[in-house]
């Protein structure tokens, strides 16, 4: 925690959550990288003198190309059931940075926290700024034990009802993509019931009328049922799910908008953008400024 008693706000520029100091003969770092549908590719390398940084500056998409956790084996490369292994992560969904520095004595320091890039924070007097928690576990029985320890901790202390039985669900996306109507969805619910599934989840494609959501190029932001697909609304689907004894879920992405939408036409100023810069689209969409009181 950081606080002060100056008369004016203090600008915080660099504030890590933790620093671990290790002394071992060798250090083997495992990191995970990838992309959509190609996630968590494993790379292990021995650390030598100097710095190795794992970080991201993508903000809300912080875990898209690099995962916010690491694995460190001591003395030897990592094994499943033997050897010393430390696994760490940070309780933070934005820009992060892990710095691994081996010095001239072959000692290792691991500094973890919010990425200082574009992260200046104005802290008023007598208020407290709390850095995100750094979570780690240590194993003498390899990465398998470390992984299980993290799973146990998450179930017992982090995840709501973490030890309850997990629900099974049927999501219509891979079955229909954007091409569905009320009857097709009810038919999928019937099949879900036969399988003993606990929940039916209605995915992307159920909304917008002026620009119906028939692809990812339009409709995002217009949160009303598409009359051509769901003439009786989402309520009819909920009723059908209740009759069949299954739960009903629905997909929504309220923070995003397509340029081809009624919302964008009426409130273009609600979109986050940089002055004098062209709009940038990812999956044909942009981010809404949820801090805008309008």
Protein language model annotation of sequence segments:
Residues 1-101, 107, 117:
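Polysaccharide-binding surfaces and accessory modules of carbohydrate-active proteins
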Residues 4-7, 138-139, 255-257:
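Short coil/turn motifs at secondary-structure junctions
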Residues 84-90, 146-156, 294:
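Short, Φ-rich (hydrophobic/aromatic) sequence segments
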Residues 85, 128, 167:
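A residue-level signal for beta-strand positions that form part of recognition/binding surfaces
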Residues 104-124:
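Short acidic, Pro/Gly- and aromatic-enriched capping/linker segments at domain boundaries
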Residues 121-140:
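Short Pro-Gly-centered flexible turn/kink motifs
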Residues 136-167, 174:
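Terminal connector regions
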Residues 161-294:
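Aromatic-lined carbohydrate-binding/catalytic grooves of carbohydrate-active enzymes
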